[in-house]
């Protein structure tokens, strides 16, 4: 189609943000158009189209329909569409979003297909190449890294629709910018990430918490002391308070020394006549602490500050796949708090010129910050979402279950990358969290293919339906090839059976008898 060719005309009552048009040919939903009138040069997105035939509107008899079809021609058909007005492209070189016009265009104004060169100016000036427009393969889409990281991001989609690939592409692009990234990797998908086109700077951080530095309730939770254990918890708190008054962290050489010191205090209480009535509860608390030493040894330590483990300008991966939900909550909250406090301290003590920006990616965000359940991590994610921008701490929530993700935290994510969502409750939850997600764009979510996404927010000049690049490398999020694995396992199993049969055939014979 000629870029200067008129594709249709505005009709009906027009608005500054939305137009109805009558088209010559059906444009692709998600494609871009241009409208010139008065002193404005507007860019718009085709949000929906319908086709009709006035001669067939009230036909209910199939024979009548077939007879009419014999005599009809293309002039009987009409195409109507809806355009979302995105703004005046004369503002394109200015910082920020395009501005809507003050006056809507009149009905009958011609509509043109936006040319590729214009769209390349709109979408090609960012830092992070994420993909290309679904409707224009030659138009690359690049996101503004400053606005993506500082105004927070949510990556939302059904399982298998390309979330992990999107994260991998973003990691590759952030790596090019020498960004400092921290990934809470719930399923170990990224710990072995490899890229063919770019040498990734990857640093693995083992999930650890300083048992001396966490608060008393977190220690009790980690030890498995029930939140309703109104006798066990006060005794543990009392023991910790006395220990910390007597000895500092450097006085303990190992975790065992510290926990055994607490257990020693509890043993003293147990043998004290004043606490005889609670002897059973105290003993249970001792058992819980002993169990913690045995079963939580992999994540508890002393003399540890997670900030010292984070490498600047690296993709820092924290594999969490071996931790249960409770341990994940404590580890995430502990590290998230440490990062926010550290970045705040740098700004307050040294000033903005010494800031150390960091972008934190939280996989399975609906488990860390659930909608209807209180968690420690949700508190700190919410704080980062509200305060992080001022201190260079960016947030990315990744989830396949948006409806169970905390709405307050999600609403602070101004940037959205949304792939296919079918459930109406998921769609509604996301729409309520984003004022920029129109009803017509929501309707597009069910028809997106694997790897396609709607991107909107400050990181992009105007909303776009994008084909996200296929990550050129390896990570752990791809679907398993079940048929291939079954076949391979079957061959190996049959080979072992054959070997056993051959071995048994000769095993009982004495060849030298």
Swiss-Prot record:
The entry's keywords: ATP-binding, DNA-binding, Helicase, Hydrolase, Isomerase, Nucleotide-binding
GO MF annotation terms: ATP binding; ATP hydrolysis activity; helicase activity
Lineage: Archaea, Methanobacteriati, Methanobacteriota, Methanomada group, Methanococci
Keyword Iron: no
Amino-acid positions noted as binding ATP in the UniProt annotation, renumbered to this chain: 151, 160-165, 467-468
Functional summary from the UniProt entry: A probably bidirectional DNA helicase.
Transmembrane spans: none
Keyword rRNA-binding: no
Covalent S-S links between cysteines: none
Name of the protein described by the UniProt record: Probable helicase MJ1565
Catalytic class of the enzyme: isomerase
Catalysed reaction, written as an equation: Couples ATP hydrolysis with the unwinding of duplex DNA at the replication fork by translocating in the 5'-3' direction. This creates two antiparallel DNA single strands (ssDNA). The leading ssDNA polymer is the template for DNA polymerase III holoenzyme which synthesizes a continuous strand; ATP + H2O = ADP + phosphate + H(+); Couples ATP hydrolysis with the unwinding of duplex DNA by translocating in the 3'-5' direction
Pfam families listed in its UniProt record: DUF87, HAS-barrel, HerA_C
InterPro entries according to UniProt: HerA-like (IPR008571), HerA_barrel_dom (IPR018538), HerA_C (IPR033186), HerA_central (IPR002789), P-loop_NTPase (IPR027417)
Enzyme Commission numbers on file: 5.6.2.3, 5.6.2.4
Membership in a protein family: Belongs to the HerA family.
